[in-house]
Amino acid sequence: MAATVREAIRELMTQTMATMDALLEASDRELTTASSHACAQGKDLWTLITNDIDHEKIHTGQILEARYESRITASRMQRLLAEWLEERARLIGSLIGLTDEQFNRETAPGEWTYRVVAKHVLTLEQDSLKTIAVDQATRPSHG
């Protein structure tokens, strides 16, 4: 694991993409195949993956509890970033399972396509970051 928090987060994000790619390549049928991994508890791939999900939840709780007990409270910006990341994961999760054809269909008659919605979110975020950078550059420095 990386030595710094930022590097560890980047490593976790990179692994998230690798895991997502691997699982998207697998079929639903494969979920019922036997797994030799100890965490599958002698069962199938479904059990292995759901145990991995539960395992992550357990350790997330461990970290949150340790931070609480140690009074390591996130700053407003850190909390904002963590909540934004949760929502980004929900957005990505809502797109998983759509075919490319479905991705380019309207979400409802006369409404934006799924692709346009995703692009809109991305464009708005990029515009917000540009505005933040411009605003920071035009503020008088404190010092």
What feature does the model see in each segment?
Residues M1-G143:
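Aromatic-glycine hotspot motif
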